[in-house]
Amino acid sequence: MRFSLCDNTKTAYKLMTSAFFCYADSSAFFIKGGNMLTSLAFIFLLGLILGSLFTKLKLPALLGMIITGIILGPYVLNLLDSSILSISSSLRQLALVIILTRAGLAMDIEDLKKAGRPAFLMCFLPALFEITGTVLIAPKLLGITVLEAAIIGSVIAAVSPAVVVPRMLKLIEEKRGTGKSIPQLIMAGASVDDVFVIVLFTSFLGFEKGGELSAIKLVYVPVSIIVGIIVGLIAGYILVRLFKKFHMRDSVKVVILLCVSFLLLELEKKIGEKVPFSALIAVMSIGVGILKNYDILAKRLSAKFSKLWVAAEILLFVLVGATVDIKYAVAAGVLALILILGALIFRMAGVFCCLLGSRLDTKERVFTMMAYTPKATVQAAIGGIPLAMGLACGELTLTIAVLSILVTAPLGAAAVDYSYKKLLKQE
Protein backbone atom coordinates (compact mmCIF):
# COMPACT_ATOMS: atom_id res chain seq x y z
CA MET A 1 0.00 0.00 0.00
CA ARG A 2 1.55 3.28 -1.08
CA PHE A 3 0.62 6.89 -0.49
CA SER A 4 2.02 10.06 -2.01
CA LEU A 5 2.06 13.52 -0.53
CA CYS A 6 2.77 16.45 -2.84
CA ASP A 7 5.15 19.19 -1.75
CA ASN A 8 2.29 21.64 -1.17
CA THR A 9 0.84 19.43 1.54
CA LYS A 10 4.03 18.85 3.51
CA THR A 11 3.39 21.80 5.82
CA ALA A 12 -0.18 20.67 6.45
CA TYR A 13 1.08 17.15 7.02
CA LYS A 14 3.55 18.34 9.67
CA LEU A 15 0.88 20.48 11.32
CA MET A 16 -1.52 17.51 11.45
CA THR A 17 1.12 15.35 13.08
CA SER A 18 2.05 18.05 15.60
CA ALA A 19 -1.59 18.78 16.33
CA PHE A 20 -2.27 15.13 17.02
CA PHE A 21 0.48 14.85 19.60
CA CYS A 22 -0.51 18.16 21.20
CA TYR A 23 -4.07 16.90 21.36
CA ALA A 24 -2.89 13.56 22.71
CA ASP A 25 -0.97 15.36 25.43
CA SER A 26 -4.26 15.97 27.14
CA SER A 27 -4.80 12.22 27.11
CA ALA A 28 -6.72 12.21 30.36
CA PHE A 29 -9.63 13.74 28.48
CA PHE A 30 -9.64 11.00 25.85
CA ILE A 31 -9.13 8.18 28.32
CA LYS A 32 -12.12 9.32 30.38
CA GLY A 33 -14.36 10.67 27.62
CA GLY A 34 -13.16 8.81 24.55
CA ASN A 35 -15.05 6.02 22.86
CA MET A 36 -14.70 3.49 20.10
CA LEU A 37 -15.27 6.06 17.33
CA THR A 38 -12.56 8.35 18.72
CA SER A 39 -10.18 5.40 18.87
CA LEU A 40 -10.98 4.42 15.28
CA ALA A 41 -10.35 8.01 14.16
CA PHE A 42 -6.92 7.92 15.84
CA ILE A 43 -6.13 4.50 14.35
CA PHE A 44 -6.95 5.45 10.76
CA LEU A 45 -5.63 9.04 10.76
CA LEU A 46 -2.31 8.39 12.45
CA GLY A 47 -1.97 5.05 10.64
CA LEU A 48 -2.36 6.85 7.30
CA ILE A 49 0.07 9.61 8.30
CA LEU A 50 2.85 7.37 9.58
CA GLY A 51 2.27 4.85 6.77
CA SER A 52 2.71 7.69 4.27
CA LEU A 53 5.79 8.98 6.06
CA PHE A 54 7.49 5.58 6.07
CA THR A 55 6.67 5.11 2.38
CA LYS A 56 8.36 8.47 1.70
CA LEU A 57 11.39 7.18 3.61
CA LYS A 58 11.46 4.09 1.32
CA LEU A 59 10.36 1.87 4.22
CA PRO A 60 7.30 -0.43 4.38
CA ALA A 61 4.11 1.43 5.32
CA LEU A 62 3.21 -1.38 7.74
CA LEU A 63 6.14 -0.36 9.96
CA GLY A 64 4.55 3.06 10.40
CA MET A 65 1.25 1.39 11.21
CA ILE A 66 2.81 -0.91 13.81
CA ILE A 67 4.52 2.10 15.42
CA THR A 68 1.14 3.88 15.39
CA GLY A 69 -0.30 1.02 17.41
CA ILE A 70 2.61 1.08 19.86
CA ILE A 71 2.15 4.84 20.39
CA LEU A 72 -1.63 4.70 20.77
CA GLY A 73 -1.68 1.43 22.71
CA PRO A 74 -1.99 0.79 26.43
CA TYR A 75 1.78 0.70 27.01
CA VAL A 76 2.59 4.24 25.76
CA LEU A 77 -0.12 6.96 25.41
CA ASN A 78 -3.05 4.64 26.20
CA LEU A 79 -5.42 6.48 23.84
CA LEU A 80 -7.34 3.46 22.58
CA ASP A 81 -10.66 2.84 24.26
CA SER A 82 -11.00 -0.46 26.12
CA SER A 83 -13.93 -1.40 23.87
CA ILE A 84 -11.56 -1.44 20.86
CA LEU A 85 -8.88 -3.41 22.71
CA SER A 86 -11.42 -5.97 23.93
CA ILE A 87 -12.41 -6.82 20.34
CA SER A 88 -8.92 -6.34 18.89
CA SER A 89 -8.56 -10.06 18.18
CA SER A 90 -11.85 -10.16 16.24
CA LEU A 91 -10.94 -7.05 14.24
CA ARG A 92 -7.57 -8.55 13.33
CA GLN A 93 -9.36 -11.71 12.23
CA LEU A 94 -11.69 -9.60 10.06
CA ALA A 95 -8.66 -8.12 8.30
CA LEU A 96 -7.21 -11.61 7.81
CA VAL A 97 -10.50 -12.78 6.27
CA ILE A 98 -10.33 -9.93 3.75
CA ILE A 99 -6.76 -10.62 2.67
CA LEU A 100 -7.18 -14.42 2.58
CA THR A 101 -10.33 -14.06 0.47
CA ARG A 102 -8.34 -11.86 -1.92
CA ALA A 103 -5.65 -14.54 -1.98
CA GLY A 104 -8.17 -17.25 -2.85
CA LEU A 105 -9.75 -15.15 -5.61
CA ALA A 106 -6.32 -14.86 -7.26
CA MET A 107 -5.13 -18.44 -6.68
CA ASP A 108 -5.62 -20.62 -9.73
CA ILE A 109 -5.52 -24.35 -8.91
CA GLU A 110 -3.68 -24.99 -12.18
CA ASP A 111 -0.87 -22.68 -11.03
CA LEU A 112 -0.52 -24.66 -7.80
CA LYS A 113 -0.40 -27.89 -9.79
CA LYS A 114 2.48 -26.40 -11.78
CA ALA A 115 4.32 -25.62 -8.54
CA GLY A 116 3.91 -29.27 -7.52
CA ARG A 117 5.99 -30.76 -4.68
CA PRO A 118 7.52 -27.44 -3.46
CA ALA A 119 4.02 -26.02 -2.86
CA PHE A 120 3.24 -28.96 -0.55
CA LEU A 121 6.58 -28.83 1.30
CA MET A 122 6.36 -25.05 1.86
CA CYS A 123 3.28 -25.63 4.02
CA PHE A 124 5.28 -27.20 6.86
CA LEU A 125 9.00 -27.80 6.20
CA PRO A 126 10.31 -24.22 6.75
CA ALA A 127 8.38 -24.01 10.05
CA LEU A 128 9.81 -27.36 11.16
CA PHE A 129 13.32 -26.16 10.33
CA GLU A 130 12.78 -22.94 12.32
CA ILE A 131 11.43 -24.78 15.37
CA THR A 132 14.35 -27.22 15.16
CA GLY A 133 16.79 -24.31 14.95
CA THR A 134 15.22 -22.71 18.03
CA VAL A 135 15.43 -26.01 19.94
CA LEU A 136 19.13 -26.31 19.06
CA ILE A 137 20.08 -22.68 19.78
CA ALA A 138 17.85 -21.46 22.63
CA PRO A 139 18.81 -23.90 25.44
CA LYS A 140 22.51 -23.06 25.09
CA LEU A 141 21.94 -19.36 24.47
CA LEU A 142 19.21 -18.64 27.05
CA GLY A 143 19.55 -21.52 29.52
CA ILE A 144 16.04 -22.91 29.01
CA THR A 145 14.76 -26.48 28.56
CA VAL A 146 14.29 -28.15 25.19
CA LEU A 147 10.49 -28.11 25.60
CA GLU A 148 10.49 -24.40 26.48
CA ALA A 149 12.61 -23.80 23.38
CA ALA A 150 10.06 -25.77 21.32
CA ILE A 151 7.25 -23.54 22.66
CA ILE A 152 9.20 -20.40 21.72
CA GLY A 153 10.04 -21.91 18.34
CA SER A 154 6.39 -22.66 17.59
CA VAL A 155 5.43 -19.08 18.49
CA ILE A 156 7.95 -17.45 16.16
CA ALA A 157 7.77 -20.04 13.35
CA ALA A 158 4.53 -18.86 11.73
CA VAL A 159 4.91 -16.59 8.71
CA SER A 160 2.44 -13.68 8.45
CA PRO A 161 -0.14 -13.92 5.62
CA ALA A 162 -1.05 -10.28 6.29
CA VAL A 163 2.47 -9.21 5.28
CA VAL A 164 3.13 -11.80 2.58
CA VAL A 165 -0.19 -12.16 0.73
CA PRO A 166 -0.69 -8.50 -0.36
CA ARG A 167 2.81 -8.47 -1.81
CA MET A 168 2.27 -11.71 -3.69
CA LEU A 169 -1.01 -10.37 -5.09
CA LYS A 170 0.90 -7.34 -6.34
CA LEU A 171 3.38 -9.65 -8.07
CA ILE A 172 0.51 -11.52 -9.75
CA GLU A 173 -0.93 -8.20 -10.99
CA GLU A 174 2.49 -7.18 -12.35
CA LYS A 175 3.08 -10.70 -13.73
CA ARG A 176 6.37 -11.10 -11.85
CA GLY A 177 7.42 -14.71 -11.34
CA THR A 178 4.01 -15.97 -12.45
CA GLY A 179 5.50 -18.15 -15.20
CA LYS A 180 6.80 -20.48 -12.47
CA SER A 181 3.87 -19.77 -10.08
CA ILE A 182 6.21 -18.23 -7.48
CA PRO A 183 3.66 -15.82 -5.90
CA GLN A 184 1.03 -18.59 -5.73
CA LEU A 185 3.56 -20.98 -4.18
CA ILE A 186 4.48 -18.48 -1.44
CA MET A 187 0.88 -17.38 -0.86
CA ALA A 188 -0.49 -20.91 -0.40
CA GLY A 189 2.37 -21.96 1.87
CA ALA A 190 2.07 -18.85 4.05
CA SER A 191 -1.63 -19.52 4.64
CA VAL A 192 -1.34 -23.23 5.52
CA ASP A 193 1.89 -22.78 7.51
CA ASP A 194 -0.01 -20.98 10.30
CA VAL A 195 -2.41 -23.87 10.88
CA PHE A 196 0.46 -26.33 11.17
CA VAL A 197 2.39 -24.14 13.63
CA ILE A 198 -0.61 -23.37 15.87
CA VAL A 199 -1.39 -27.09 16.29
CA LEU A 200 2.23 -27.74 17.27
CA PHE A 201 2.11 -24.80 19.70
CA THR A 202 -0.99 -26.12 21.50
CA SER A 203 0.56 -29.61 21.65
CA PHE A 204 3.79 -28.29 23.22
CA LEU A 205 1.79 -26.22 25.73
CA GLY A 206 -0.20 -29.27 26.80
CA PHE A 207 2.98 -31.28 27.24
CA GLU A 208 4.59 -28.51 29.32
CA LYS A 209 1.51 -28.39 31.58
CA GLY A 210 1.92 -32.08 32.38
CA GLY A 211 -0.01 -33.65 29.54
CA GLU A 212 1.21 -35.91 26.77
CA LEU A 213 2.39 -35.03 23.30
CA SER A 214 -0.47 -36.82 21.56
CA ALA A 215 0.06 -38.23 18.08
CA ILE A 216 -3.65 -37.68 17.46
CA LYS A 217 -3.17 -33.91 17.78
CA LEU A 218 -0.45 -34.04 15.14
CA VAL A 219 -2.82 -35.93 12.81
CA TYR A 220 -5.23 -33.00 13.27
CA VAL A 221 -2.93 -30.84 11.12
CA PRO A 222 -3.49 -32.47 7.71
CA VAL A 223 -7.10 -33.36 8.56
CA SER A 224 -8.01 -29.76 9.50
CA ILE A 225 -6.39 -28.45 6.31
CA ILE A 226 -8.12 -31.01 4.06
CA VAL A 227 -11.53 -30.47 5.72
CA GLY A 228 -11.05 -26.70 5.45
CA ILE A 229 -10.27 -26.95 1.72
CA ILE A 230 -13.27 -29.22 1.04
CA VAL A 231 -15.71 -27.02 3.01
CA GLY A 232 -14.37 -23.88 1.31
CA LEU A 233 -14.58 -25.32 -2.22
CA ILE A 234 -18.15 -26.55 -1.60
CA ALA A 235 -19.15 -23.15 -0.16
CA GLY A 236 -17.54 -21.41 -3.15
CA TYR A 237 -19.47 -23.63 -5.59
CA ILE A 238 -22.79 -22.99 -3.78
CA LEU A 239 -22.16 -19.23 -3.77
CA VAL A 240 -21.41 -19.25 -7.51
CA ARG A 241 -24.72 -21.04 -8.17
CA LEU A 242 -26.49 -18.50 -5.94
CA PHE A 243 -24.86 -15.51 -7.65
CA LYS A 244 -25.71 -16.86 -11.12
CA LYS A 245 -29.34 -17.51 -10.21
CA PHE A 246 -30.08 -14.26 -8.37
CA HIS A 247 -28.96 -10.93 -9.79
CA MET A 248 -27.33 -8.66 -7.19
CA ARG A 249 -24.67 -5.99 -7.03
CA ASP A 250 -21.06 -7.06 -6.48
CA SER A 251 -21.06 -5.08 -3.23
CA VAL A 252 -23.87 -7.30 -1.93
CA LYS A 253 -21.88 -10.38 -2.96
CA VAL A 254 -18.94 -9.09 -0.92
CA VAL A 255 -21.20 -8.72 2.14
CA ILE A 256 -22.49 -12.28 1.66
CA LEU A 257 -18.93 -13.60 1.29
CA LEU A 258 -17.87 -11.87 4.51
CA CYS A 259 -20.90 -13.23 6.38
CA VAL A 260 -20.17 -16.79 5.23
CA SER A 261 -16.55 -16.35 6.34
CA PHE A 262 -17.61 -15.13 9.79
CA LEU A 263 -19.94 -18.12 10.16
CA LEU A 264 -17.08 -20.47 9.27
CA LEU A 265 -14.89 -18.86 11.95
CA GLU A 266 -17.66 -19.41 14.49
CA LEU A 267 -18.15 -22.98 13.27
CA GLU A 268 -14.47 -23.70 13.95
CA LYS A 269 -14.89 -22.46 17.53
CA LYS A 270 -17.94 -24.67 18.06
CA ILE A 271 -16.72 -27.93 16.52
CA GLY A 272 -12.93 -27.46 16.41
CA GLU A 273 -12.31 -29.71 19.42
CA LYS A 274 -14.28 -32.62 17.95
CA VAL A 275 -13.82 -32.14 14.20
CA PRO A 276 -10.45 -30.80 12.98
CA PHE A 277 -11.32 -27.84 10.77
CA SER A 278 -9.40 -24.72 9.71
CA ALA A 279 -11.78 -21.84 9.03
CA LEU A 280 -9.08 -19.58 7.55
CA ILE A 281 -8.12 -22.27 5.02
CA ALA A 282 -11.84 -22.63 4.21
CA VAL A 283 -12.14 -18.85 3.72
CA MET A 284 -9.28 -18.87 1.22
CA SER A 285 -10.70 -21.95 -0.51
CA ILE A 286 -14.03 -20.17 -1.07
CA GLY A 287 -12.15 -17.68 -3.23
CA VAL A 288 -10.39 -20.53 -5.06
CA GLY A 289 -13.78 -22.16 -5.72
CA ILE A 290 -15.26 -18.94 -7.09
CA LEU A 291 -12.26 -18.40 -9.38
CA LYS A 292 -12.51 -21.96 -10.71
CA ASN A 293 -16.26 -21.80 -11.41
CA TYR A 294 -16.81 -18.11 -12.28
CA ASP A 295 -13.51 -16.41 -13.09
CA ILE A 296 -15.03 -13.14 -14.38
CA LEU A 297 -16.82 -12.63 -11.05
CA ALA A 298 -13.65 -13.55 -9.13
CA LYS A 299 -11.76 -10.69 -10.80
CA ARG A 300 -14.52 -8.20 -9.99
CA LEU A 301 -14.76 -9.35 -6.36
CA SER A 302 -10.98 -9.23 -6.02
CA ALA A 303 -11.09 -5.54 -6.99
CA LYS A 304 -13.75 -4.94 -4.30
CA PHE A 305 -11.72 -6.73 -1.62
CA SER A 306 -8.64 -4.79 -2.71
CA LYS A 307 -10.45 -1.57 -1.74
CA LEU A 308 -11.54 -3.05 1.59
CA TRP A 309 -7.91 -3.97 2.32
CA VAL A 310 -6.91 -0.28 2.32
CA ALA A 311 -8.75 0.19 5.63
CA ALA A 312 -8.28 -3.37 6.88
CA GLU A 313 -4.48 -3.19 6.54
CA ILE A 314 -4.31 -0.09 8.74
CA LEU A 315 -6.63 -1.64 11.32
CA LEU A 316 -4.71 -4.92 11.39
CA PHE A 317 -1.19 -3.57 11.80
CA VAL A 318 -2.14 -0.75 14.18
CA LEU A 319 -3.87 -3.29 16.43
CA VAL A 320 -0.88 -5.64 16.15
CA GLY A 321 1.28 -2.72 17.31
CA ALA A 322 -1.12 -2.05 20.18
CA THR A 323 -0.42 -5.55 21.54
CA VAL A 324 3.32 -4.82 21.71
CA ASP A 325 4.66 -3.93 25.15
CA ILE A 326 7.82 -2.08 24.15
CA LYS A 327 9.51 -2.73 27.49
CA TYR A 328 9.68 -6.44 26.61
CA ALA A 329 11.43 -5.62 23.34
CA VAL A 330 13.90 -3.32 25.14
CA ALA A 331 14.55 -5.96 27.81
CA ALA A 332 15.08 -8.71 25.25
CA GLY A 333 18.70 -7.86 24.69
CA VAL A 334 21.14 -9.11 22.10
CA LEU A 335 20.70 -12.81 22.91
CA ALA A 336 17.02 -12.82 21.94
CA LEU A 337 17.88 -11.03 18.70
CA ILE A 338 20.59 -13.60 17.95
CA LEU A 339 18.05 -16.39 18.53
CA ILE A 340 15.52 -14.82 16.13
CA LEU A 341 18.13 -14.30 13.41
CA GLY A 342 19.56 -17.80 13.93
CA ALA A 343 16.08 -19.34 13.67
CA LEU A 344 15.47 -17.36 10.48
CA ILE A 345 18.60 -18.87 8.94
CA PHE A 346 17.20 -22.32 9.69
CA ARG A 347 13.86 -21.26 8.17
CA MET A 348 15.52 -20.05 4.98
CA ALA A 349 17.43 -23.34 4.80
CA GLY A 350 14.06 -25.10 5.03
CA VAL A 351 12.72 -23.05 2.11
CA PHE A 352 15.87 -23.88 0.14
CA CYS A 353 15.28 -27.61 0.74
CA CYS A 354 11.67 -27.26 -0.42
CA LEU A 355 12.89 -25.80 -3.72
CA LEU A 356 15.52 -28.46 -4.46
CA GLY A 357 14.79 -30.02 -7.83
CA SER A 358 12.34 -27.25 -8.78
CA ARG A 359 12.48 -25.09 -11.91
CA LEU A 360 13.42 -21.97 -9.92
CA ASP A 361 16.81 -20.40 -10.63
CA THR A 362 19.14 -19.03 -7.94
CA LYS A 363 17.66 -15.51 -7.90
CA GLU A 364 14.12 -16.84 -7.62
CA ARG A 365 15.10 -19.15 -4.77
CA VAL A 366 16.74 -16.27 -2.89
CA PHE A 367 13.57 -14.20 -3.32
CA THR A 368 11.36 -17.03 -2.05
CA MET A 369 13.59 -17.48 1.00
CA MET A 370 13.35 -13.77 1.86
CA ALA A 371 9.61 -13.59 1.21
CA TYR A 372 9.01 -16.35 3.76
CA THR A 373 10.48 -14.48 6.74
CA PRO A 374 7.97 -11.81 7.98
CA LYS A 375 6.18 -12.47 11.30
CA ALA A 376 3.29 -10.47 12.80
CA THR A 377 -0.27 -11.73 13.19
CA VAL A 378 0.20 -15.17 14.79
CA GLN A 379 2.91 -13.86 17.14
CA ALA A 380 0.57 -11.08 18.30
CA ALA A 381 -2.23 -13.61 18.84
CA ILE A 382 -0.41 -16.36 20.74
CA GLY A 383 2.79 -14.75 22.10
CA GLY A 384 1.22 -13.93 25.47
CA ILE A 385 -0.52 -17.28 26.07
CA PRO A 386 2.38 -19.03 27.89
CA LEU A 387 2.67 -16.03 30.26
CA ALA A 388 -1.09 -16.06 30.90
CA MET A 389 -0.83 -19.80 31.70
CA GLY A 390 1.88 -19.09 34.27
CA LEU A 391 4.64 -21.02 32.48
CA ALA A 392 8.22 -20.31 33.54
CA CYS A 393 9.13 -19.39 29.96
CA GLY A 394 6.08 -17.12 29.57
CA GLU A 395 7.76 -13.73 29.84
CA LEU A 396 10.68 -14.79 27.65
CA THR A 397 8.28 -16.18 25.02
CA LEU A 398 6.32 -12.91 24.91
CA THR A 399 9.55 -10.91 24.71
CA ILE A 400 10.84 -12.91 21.75
CA ALA A 401 7.43 -12.81 20.03
CA VAL A 402 7.35 -9.00 20.32
CA LEU A 403 10.90 -8.66 19.06
CA SER A 404 10.25 -11.02 16.14
CA ILE A 405 7.39 -8.77 14.99
CA LEU A 406 9.47 -5.60 15.25
CA VAL A 407 12.44 -7.13 13.43
CA THR A 408 11.03 -9.47 10.79
CA ALA A 409 7.83 -7.72 9.66
CA PRO A 410 9.52 -4.56 8.34
CA LEU A 411 12.71 -6.32 7.19
CA GLY A 412 10.84 -9.08 5.37
CA ALA A 413 8.43 -6.61 3.77
CA ALA A 414 11.29 -4.35 2.68
CA ALA A 415 13.25 -7.31 1.29
CA VAL A 416 10.29 -8.24 -0.93
CA ASP A 417 9.43 -4.67 -1.94
CA TYR A 418 12.93 -3.73 -3.04
CA SER A 419 14.19 -6.98 -4.53
CA TYR A 420 11.37 -8.45 -6.61
CA LYS A 421 12.12 -6.40 -9.73
CA LYS A 422 15.74 -7.56 -9.66
CA LEU A 423 15.12 -11.19 -8.76
CA LEU A 424 11.91 -12.11 -10.59
CA LYS A 425 11.29 -12.08 -14.33
CA GLN A 426 8.28 -10.25 -15.75
CA GLU A 427 6.18 -12.57 -17.91
Model-derived features with residue positions:
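Transmembrane helical cores of multi-pass secondary ion antiporters/exchangers
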Residues: N8, A12-L15, C22-D25, F29-E427
